Structures are given as C-alpha cells and as structure tokens.
C-alpha cells in the first residue's frame, strides 16, 4: 500500500496541496519531509505524537524525516490556533528546552535516517535589511491578511512579531528544500496557511514547477467533542518525570470504546487485520477492554520502551488485586503520583490519631467507625484494631505510607525525618 493510501486509511490525512502529485512522488523515490515544533516547553506531550506518528510512518517506509526545532521561531511565537499572544521565553530557557526535546525525539526516531535541525542556526544570521530585501518583498500583504491564522486575530489584535511568523516558517521550508532536499511539510490543521506560504515562496524563488508539497492532519477530537490530549490533570507528557509511564499507560487504557479503534489506527503500527480483530472485540466483548489494553501497550512501548510497559502492567495488576505490599518503592512513586498526598513525620502513632492528624479522616468518630468496619488499609493490609500503632517507616524504604479508605480512595503519605 502506498504511504499516502495508508495515511488515508488511518484517518491521518486532512488536506493536501496535491495529493496525486505526492502519491506519484513517493512511488518514484524516497523523499525527505519535515515537521516543525517550537521549544515552548521542556517536554513533548501526546499532542506532539499526532504529527510525529505520521513522520514515523514515513520513516518506516524508507523516507527520511526531519524535525525542525524552532529555536528561532520559538523566540517569536506561533499565533496559529491561539486567541492571545504567547509569553516569550528567554534565550537560555529556549536553549534548555531545545536540548530536552532533542533527547526525546531521538528516543522516538533513533539516529538512522533521521535528522534534527534548529532554525535558529539560519534565522539568527539575517539582518533586518536582509529579511526585508530578500523575503519581505516576496509576500503580498493582502494574502497574508487573509490567512486564517491572521484573519482570526485581527479584531482582537495581533502584533507585527506574530504577523511575520508565517514568513519565517516559509523561509524554513525554503532552507530545508535547498539544504536537506525536503519536499514535503506536514503539520496540524491550523498550519495550513503557514505551509502554503512556504510552498508559494519556494515556487517564487526556485520556479513554479518545483515539486514541493504540504499536508495537514485532522484535528483529533474525542467522541464527546472535546479535544484529544487533555485530562482533568492537564497535559499528558512524554517525559517520564512529568507523567510516569504508569500514568501514561493508564491514559490510553481508559479511552472510550467509541474512540479506541480510531486511536489504534492512528497511534499504533498494527496492521489492518489486527485492528479489525480488535474492533470486533470492542463490539462483541467490550467489557474485556482488549482494544484499550493493546492500545496502551503499543503506545507506551513506543514512547517509553517494553520494560516500562511491563512495569506499568505489573503496577496495574497489583493495584487491582489490592496487594500494595508487592510494589517496590519506585513503583509506589509511579502508581500514586497523581493521588492526593500528605507530609507526615516518621514517628509512630495511634492509627485513629494518625488518620485525623493527616486529615485523611475528618474526625475521630469517623476514623474509629472506618477502622472498626474494615474500611482502612495501610500499605495493603486491613487495620481493624483501634489501638493499633502505625509506623510510617515500616514499608517502602521508610519513605511512604499508602492508605486506602473504602474501595478506591487512596492517599500517599510522604515520610520526612
């Protein structure tokens, strides 16, 4: 199957400047293509996986992906998809972010048949006179004003800095065409105007018959109409220090039946036959959640590796069984990273007093009632003795106490000396 046809089957293709021309080109030869991301943070998040999965599919088909980190454009701020102007980062902070993102991208793409570039390397060499003389005269103001990314901001106001962003992105495409033989730019649906600006610039400078293309990816929406990638707790990061592999795994495991097949097509490398089989399972045995489990396994392994997936599944099984004592200290940190936590001293205390002092229980009366009724578990073990003494350093290297009140209400007590 041609790579373009596969992208269409997977629901990954939204707009294309010349779909047939691109199909012919990718059948004739292996091409270089690029996607850009500005270093506005020190970690990628799952929203970045949307364009990166397309790049990865091209890479697996033998093409050469290039990721452009916007060390230069990041100092300006992309207005695409925004109602207000971005707060700009300092030069040193941007450079730190560039280094962090580079490490994560190498983890996803490896080093073979893959290139990372930073547009600061060429954009920073322009003087204002160079910029206006060599490029400013090639852009029509009326055309720029009619681009959706600009038109949507005119009433609220857009700075000249953000207004010129599309010119800088166009220069990027031209630079990569000249120096890296890049013939295709991909981006989110909000990048269409910026992508076509780059193609127009290349045609003006290199000739109208130059074979360059642009494609965009559909906006990823959940079945309930909300945007994919956000949770009640915020973004889901690819950095394991920001979102643990267990939390990452759980995000995918908890996807709605109405969304899971779409995500299997988009975020995994499973075949049509495998996905069709999982789709049938969703329809006939949805309670088994086999499709969600496979989705979680595939994406977690792609981002964090097989060992992290195995550990996430181990934690999940232990939490389901309630055998908290079987977790290691590191696994406790992962499993309960998103749960309410309290700071406690290392001093042993009566269980009832301790539950009230930590505010896990609202009163001694309620604490006594819950203990007597067997509703309190300490590190996985039920406590029913009102006179029991709790030693915070007894488990997990003396660092944590895991309290469960009722069936699902966990609190992580962090022990300090």
Curated annotation (Swiss-Prot):
Q: Which residues bind L-tyrosine?
A: 34, 165, 169
Query: What range(s) does the S4 RNA-binding domain occupy?
Result: 349-415
What molecular functions are annotated in GO for this chain? ATP binding; RNA binding; tyrosine-tRNA ligase activity
Q: Which residues bind ATP?
A: 230
Name the Pfam families for this protein.
Answer: SYY_C-terminal, tRNA-synt_1b
InterPro entries the record matches: aa-tRNA-synth_I_CS, aa-tRNA-synth_Ic, Rossmann-like_a/b/a_fold, S4_RNA-bd, S4_RNA-bd_sf, SYY-like_C, Tyr-tRNA-ligase, Tyr-tRNA-ligase_bac-type
- GO cellular component terms attached to this protein's record: cytosol
Q: What is the residue range of the motif 'KMSKS' region? A: 227-231
The record, for PANTHER family, names:
TYROSINE--TRNA LIGASE, MITOCHONDRIAL, TYROSYL-TRNA SYNTHETASE
Q: What does this protein do?
A: Catalyzes the attachment of tyrosine to tRNA(Tyr) in a two-step reaction: tyrosine is first activated by ATP to form Tyr-AMP and then transferred to the acceptor end of tRNA(Tyr).
The family classification in the record reads: Belongs to the class-I aminoacyl-tRNA synthetase family. TyrS type 1 subfamily.
> This chain belongs to which protein, by name?
Tyrosine--tRNA ligase
